[in-house]
Amino acid sequence: MENRWQVQVVWMIDRMRLRTWTSLVKHHIFTTKCCKDWKYRHHYETDTPKRAGEIHIPLTERSKLVVLHYWGLACGERPWHLGHGIGLEWRQGKYSTQIDPETADQLIHTRYFTCFAAGAVRQAILGERILTFCHFQSGHRQVGTLQFLAFRKVVESQDKQPKGPRRPLPSVTKLTEDRWNKHRTTTGRRENHTLSGC
């Protein structure tokens, strides 16, 4: 019998970032209870030796999002990756498909974490106090309409905003972002053109 290969999309991340994100998820599952429906499975409860753990996030009665932690993979592009990564699956019954981090954040935001109420834009236009506030900004992928951006500015300018959780909410996009390859911008002093040869 021939070998059968299975290809999966895995986002390579460093070990410390994965530990920080996992502890943040555990904090919101067990302490703040805002993610109490989420299930954390340890590495010894999984059926694959490369899997370091799983987080099951129910979205509806039949569908769920699963964040799979992998270890012992081939080293990534950078030396600090050290063979750690995550995979994202959307499951409904026996069907499963892989999704990207932005879509995962949107799916999480449709079910969990408070957002603006439907009548909040009308309240802002009328000058009334807005009582709701979005605590999970990474769940909104697009830039948004001009009306929505103006509405957010009105909400930010209010002197009292509803308090969210003290620790940030677990965002899959933040977990998988590539901080190391971003250009660093210096703030403050401009560089001396005579010294840099420009």
Curated annotation (Swiss-Prot):
Primary site of residence: host cell
Source organism superkingdom: Viruses
Function: Counteracts the innate antiviral activity of APOBEC3G. Forms a complex with host APOBEC3G thus preventing the entry of this lethally hypermutating enzyme into progeny virions. Functions as an adapter molecule, recruiting APOBEC3G to the ubiquitin-proteasome machinery. Targets APOBEC3G for degradation through the assembly with elongin BC complex, CUL5 and RBX1. Binds viral RNA and affects the stability of viral nucleoprotein core. May play a role in viral morphology. Interacts with host ABCE1, which seems to be involved in lentiviruses capsid formation and displays RNase L inhibitor activity.
Residue ranges of the motif HCCH motif: 109-140
Biased composition (Basic and acidic residues): 188-198
Region (RNA-binding): 76-115
Annotated spans, Membrane association: 177-178
Cellular compartments per GO CC: host cell cytoplasm; host cell plasma membrane; membrane; virion component
Record's note on what induces expression: Expressed late during infection in a Rev-dependent manner.
GO biological process: viral life cycle
More about this protein: Required for replication in 'nonpermissive' cells, including primary T-cells, macrophages and certain T-cell lines, but is dispensable for replication in 'permissive' cell lines, such as 293T cells. In nonpermissive cells, Vif-defective viruses can produce virions, but they fail to complete reverse transcription and cannot successfully infect new cells. Vif-defective viruses show catastrophic failure in reverse transcription due to APOBEC-induced mutations that initiate a DNA base repair pathway and compromise the structural integrity of the ssDNA. In the absence of Vif, the virion is morphologically abnormal.
Entry similarity comment: Belongs to the primate lentivirus group Vif protein family.
Protein name: Virion infectivity factor
Keyword Nucleus annotated: no
Organism expressing this protein natively: Simian immunodeficiency virus (isolate TAN1) (SIV-cpz)
Posttranslational modification: Highly phosphorylated on serine and threonine residues. Thr-97 and Ser-171 are phosphorylated by the mitogen activated kinase MAP4K1. Polyubiquitinated and degraded by the proteasome in the presence of APOBEC3G.
Any Pfam family matching the protein: Vif
Short motif BC-box-like motif, span: 145-154
Membrane topology annotation: Peripheral membrane protein
Domain commentary: The BC-like-box motif mediates the interaction with elongin BC complex. The HCCH motif (H-x(5)-C-x(18)-C-x(5)-H) mediates the interaction with CUL5.
Subcellular location: Host cytoplasm; Host cell membrane; Virion
UniProt keyword list: Host cell membrane, Host cytoplasm, Host membrane, Host-virus interaction, Membrane, Phosphoprotein, RNA-binding, Ubl conjugation, Ubl conjugation pathway, Virion
Location of region: Multimerization: 152-170
Subunit structure, interactors included: Homomultimer; in vitro and presumably in vivo. Interacts with viral Pr55Gag precursor, host APOBEC3G, UBCE7IP1 isoform 3/ZIN, ABCE1 and possibly with SAT. Forms an E3 ligase complex by interacting with host CUL5 and elongin BC complex (ELOB and ELOC).
Region (Disordered): 159-198
Residues carrying Phosphothreonine: 97, 145
